Amino acid sequence: MSTEAEYLKQEDFLHRSNKLREIVDLGMNPYPYEFPGTTSVEDIKKEYISQPLGNSEDATNKETPKVKISGRMVLFRSMGKNAFAQILDNDQKIQVMFNRDFSSVAGLPVDAEISPIKFIEKKLDLGDILGIEGYLFFTHSGELTILVETVSLLCKSLISLPDKHAGLSDKETRYRKRWLDLIASDEVRQTFLKRSRIIKLIRHYMDAQGFIEVETPILQNVYGGAEATPFITMLNALHSEVFLRISPEISLKKILVGGTPRIYEIGKVFRNEGIDRTHNPEFTIIEAYATNIDYHSVMTYVENLVEHLVCELNDGSTVLTYTHLKQGPVSIDFKAPWIRMTMKDSIKTYGGVDVDLHGDHELRKILKECSSLPEESYMTAPRGSLIAALFDELVCDKLIAPHHITDHPVETTPLCKSLRSGDADFVERFESFCLGKELCNAYSELNDPLRQRVLLEQQQAKKALDPDSEYHPIDEEFLEALCQGLPPTGGFGIGIDRLVMILTNAASIRDVLYFPAMRRLESEKD
């Protein structure tokens, strides 16, 4: 049973609704269809901020440039015959001045009992979206201002804005009602503008490197490409159970078999797992593959891409400073090459454990001492899984500077080539880390179809013993494609949300997602 939204009962909503009715009673449309021909505030500032425009008297005489803008009114103060407001357009604000003898209100009847300046003072509210036509000038303090000739009400706001000084202090509200967060915070708007720019820069960089952007299905008959729990849904038209993809990897490799040598995809993936500071069930990823290269070349690709992004966003500098870390402000240089270290060496260097000197029983004892993991998760685990668990517990958080951690245990993935040294217990996989966060996952891709089948069948045997494990099913079409022939290939996946976190100094993944996953409110439940 649905209940009436609480805001409909609030005094401010009722007061603004009364104003709305009064505006309609004046014969005005508070929600017009269009307001064409506007110029952005950003473009106006770029063109006129350094020009000698003149003063308010020049503007009153219409001797200064005329402009037309639209935006949300976020500040208003009345000063006798004049009133001043700030208009927010995208991420830019500009001051406008209403004058009792000069400014008019579009659509206000000439015989209305209320004057234009009184209409502006009494009927408009902070949050209203206005169209402004008027003349530019500089105030005595040098502030670029528009003397309003005509103001048009483009949208009446019925809910008040957050306090301009306090902003939105409640994180729950910020994430649930991101539109308020965007209105209230310049910093939040800049973060999301930067996110958009980052994705554009990635596309431009990949295109310049000769990669072709492709699209693969989000709904899959067989999920794979990662070890994760999928979301399951039903395709009614085919009476078939399907999965939201946990990775585009398998589909992308099928395209490589078809003869396209360099491809990438930017898109959503879905993993039905936990939510924390760096994880959201729905997230954006770039996966890219190139033939005739290995994981050494991929490391170079990845660090060059990230260095390029840092330079583009940071006026050519490769150094970013982070303020939210436990150890205080830290400056990090992203200039390539990054530190490269095997997983075993990283455990020895950062964790103080030389795994080659310890048997499996000893590794389990070390895990028990240093880990909060339940014992059953590792007491019967193979050696490779123990090494990977030790890395997670002892090393990850200490990788503040950019690192490539290479040569992972074979148990961590079935989709990667073994080390060319002949050690079948480890694979040519690397993960890139920064600020204690995993940023990238990459392989020398396994292209031997017979070896691939063996590894996948081994996983299925383990899944039969542990149905709750995250091993993905065998995709026979994928194995058939590999039999057709996949050239030597290197590939990588980068979580764009985490990358944006790193590039914007964000402490949580929720700060870089417009609408992160949130628990349903009681009022939203049936």
Swiss-Prot record:
Membrane-spanning residues: none
Keyword Phosphoprotein: no
Localization of this protein: Cytoplasm
Residues reported to bind Mg(2+) 2: E438
EC number: 6.1.1.6
Superkingdom: Bacteria
Keyword Protease in annotation: no
Cofactor: binding comment: Binds 3 Mg(2+) ions per subunit.
Known catalytic reactions: tRNA(Lys) + L-lysine + ATP = L-lysyl-tRNA(Lys) + AMP + diphosphate
Key words, A-Z: Aminoacyl-tRNA synthetase, ATP-binding, Cytoplasm, Ligase, Magnesium, Metal-binding, Nucleotide-binding, Protein biosynthesis
PROSITE patterns per UniProt: AA_TRNA_LIGASE_II
MF GO annotations: ATP binding; lysine-tRNA ligase activity; magnesium ion binding; tRNA binding
GO biological process: lysyl-tRNA aminoacylation
Chain positions recorded as Mg(2+) 1 binding sites: E431, E438
Main subcellular location: cytoplasm
Cofactor(s) required for function per UniProt: Mg(2+)
Cited InterPro entries: Aa-tRNA-synt_II, aa-tRNA-synth_II, aa-tRNA-synth_II/BPL/LPL, Lys-tRNA-ligase_II, Lys-tRNA-ligase_II_N, Lys-tRNA-synth_II_C, NA-bd_OB-fold, NA-bd_OB_tRNA
GO CC field: cytosol
Protein family per UniProt: Belongs to the class-II aminoacyl-tRNA synthetase family.
PANTHER family in UniProt: LYSINE--TRNA LIGASE, CHLOROPLASTIC_MITOCHONDRIAL, LYSYL-TRNA SYNTHETASE
Complex and partners: Homodimer.
Matches recorded under NCBIfam families: lysS_bact, PRK00484.1
Protein name as annotated: Lysine--tRNA ligase
Species in which this protein is naturally found: Chlamydia abortus (strain DSM 27085 / S26/3) (Chlamydophila abortus)
